[in-house]
Amino acid sequence: MEIMVSILTTTYNHNPYIIQALDSLLAQRTNFAYEIIVHDDASTDGTAEIVQTYAEKYPDKIHAVLQKENQYSKGRNVYEFMRPLIRGKYIAQCEGDDYWCDEYKLQRQVH
């Protein structure tokens, strides 16, 4: 099935929030396919390990980009690392310390 939406999520030391964020993205109810691309910018609080666990549990849905060195501090745009993975016609964004409370958010935005 063709990917309609790519959800881009950036994280850095979002350990207290990332599980709720990812669960809210996975809970989306749509009649189209979507993917989640998570970029972790070398977190030191266990965020990257959580992201990796989710990517392994949902390999068809979540793609993880895990940095060993913080790219933002080097002046790099972290979206450069996500761009090659994007397959969706549309892009949505949810930061790693945020979440979506409406399980039909994507469906409403696309249709």
Question: Where do the PLM segments sit?
Answer:
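Nucleotide-sugar donor-binding/catalytic module of glycosyltransferases
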Residues: 1-111
